[in-house]
């Protein structure tokens, strides 16, 4: 078996000749400085030198190259390379199995987590729906539209502190929601003094003069007259 040939160093260039003494000096001045930082600083200082300052080191590098050629006439630059078995070494410390036939384990884990969160949210929704049904069970069984029976609910409230306004803040003759006067009866109407083009129900006569007047019910469009509403008003008076 042939003995491996000894490694022959390359001849120094001008920068290496100059930095040999400078590196030693900088390492003594900064003992904790890393070698890479020293090389970086030496490279910056070398670039700042003028050609006249670099000339002696260039000449010394030429002389060393000539000596190197005499000593090693068959020299070829062969950079050191790492063995191929180290390069091809497995880069992953933990082997992760990936089987396309059975499905991705990471994907299945993610899907199971999503299913768990969906089941929790569905359970919360069902609990809230059950609580709502329990709360409104007796109201829904007695009346399919419990929220439309507003007159009976308002009559159960305590009397208002002011005679002209109800507890909910509306005038005594005005229902809690617009349009509910039709459900509660009193379809009779009269023209509004503030706005001639509107009709107001008769049950709003108890409003104070300074109270808010909300025109509603009928609007006279351009080209229409009040007489066109008379048949309806006459029919409403008979109800």
UniProtKB/Swiss-Prot annotation:
Q: Which GO terms describe its biological process?
A: brain development; dorsal/ventral pattern formation; negative regulation of DNA-templated transcription; negative regulation of transcription by RNA polymerase II; neuron differentiation; positive regulation of transcription by RNA polymerase II; response to steroid hormone
What the entry lists under CDD domains is as follows: HMG-box_SoxB
Q: Name one Pfam family in it.
A: HMG_box
Q: What does this protein do?
A: May function as a switch in neuronal development. Acts as a negative regulator of transcription. Plays a role in dorsoventral patterning of the embryo.
**Is-annotated flag, keyword Transcription?**
yes
Signal peptide residue numbers:
none
Q: What happens when the gene is disrupted?
A: Ventralized embryos.
Which parts of this chain does the entry mark as a DNA-binding region? 8-76
Which cysteines form disulfides? none
Q: What are its GO cellular component terms?
A: nucleus
A GO molecular-function descriptor: DNA binding
Task: Write down what this protein is called.
Answer: Transcription factor Sox-21-A
Please spell out the taxonomic lineage of the organism that makes this protein.
Eukaryota, Metazoa, Chordata, Craniata, Vertebrata
Q: Which UniProt keywords apply?
A: Developmental protein, DNA-binding, Nucleus, Repressor, Transcription, Transcription regulation
**Cellular localisation:** Nucleus
Tissues of expression: Expressed in all cells until gastrulation, becoming restricted to the developing central nervous system later, where expression is in the forebrain, midbrain and hindbrain but maximally at the midbrain-hindbrain boundary.
Q: Which InterPro entries match?
A: HMG_box_dom, HMG_box_dom_sf, SOX_fam, SRY-related_HMG-box_TF-like
PANTHER family (alphabetical): SOX TRANSCRIPTION FACTOR (PTHR10270), TRANSCRIPTION FACTOR SOX-21 (PTHR10270:SF313)
Give a yes or no for keyword Heme in this entry.
no
**Domain of life, per the record?**
Eukaryota
């Amino acid at each position: 078996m042939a003995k491996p040939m000894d490694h022959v160093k390359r001849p120094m260039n001008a920068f290496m000749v100059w930095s040999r003494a400078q590196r030693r000096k900088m390492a003594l001045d900064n003992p904790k400085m890393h070698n890479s930082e020293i090389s970086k600083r030496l490279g910056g200082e070398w670039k700042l030198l003028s050609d006249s300052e670099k000339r002696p080191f260039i000449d010394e590098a030429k002389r060393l190259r000539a000596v190197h050629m005499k000593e090693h006439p068959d020299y070829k630059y062969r950079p050191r390379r790492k063995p191929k078995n180290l390069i091809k070494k497995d880069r992953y410390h933990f082997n992760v199995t990936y089987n396309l036939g059975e499905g991705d384990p990471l994907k299945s884990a993610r899907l199971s987590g999503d299913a768990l969160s969906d089941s929790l949210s569905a359970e919360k929704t069902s609990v809230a729906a059950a609580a709502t049904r329990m709360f409104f069970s007796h109201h829904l069984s007695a009346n399919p539209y419990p929220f439309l029976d507003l007159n009976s609910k308002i009559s159960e409230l305590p009397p208002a502190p002011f005679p002209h306004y109800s507890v909910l803040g509306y005038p005594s003759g005005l229902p809690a929601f617009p349009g509910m006067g039709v459900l509660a009866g009193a379809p009779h109407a009269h023209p509004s003094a503030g706005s001639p083009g509107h009709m107001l129900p008769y049950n709003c006569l108890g409003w104070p003069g300074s109270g808010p007047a909300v025109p509603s019910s009928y609007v006279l469009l351009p080209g229409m007259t009040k007489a066109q509403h008379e048949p309806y008003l006459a029919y409403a008076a008979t109800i």
